[in-house]
Regions:
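Polybasic (Lys/Arg-rich)
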Residues: 1-69
Length: 69
């Protein structure tokens, strides 16, 4: 299982790629926030970055499944 660590807008994230076109996105910090995203096979990393920038992780429920299309 591949993991990608990156910083975006001074926040730290880990993307953990799972089977069945799913990725777990973890926003690290004082308390980790985790969401699971279903994506299509043609989804690009830049698509993830745009979505992550627009999400307010403090308002997302942990382990909620979202779909990128």
């Amino acid at each position: 299982m591949a993991k990608v660590h990156f910083n975006l807008d001074s926040k730290k994230y880990i993307m953990e790629f799972l089977p069945d076109n799913q990725v777990k996105i973890i926003q690290t910090g004082n308390e980790d926030r985790v969401i699971t995203v279903q994506y299509f096979s043609d989804t690009k990393v830049t698509d993830f970055m745009k979505c992550i920038k627009s999400w307010d992780f403090s308002k997302l429920k942990d382990k909620t499944l979202y779909t990128l299309n």
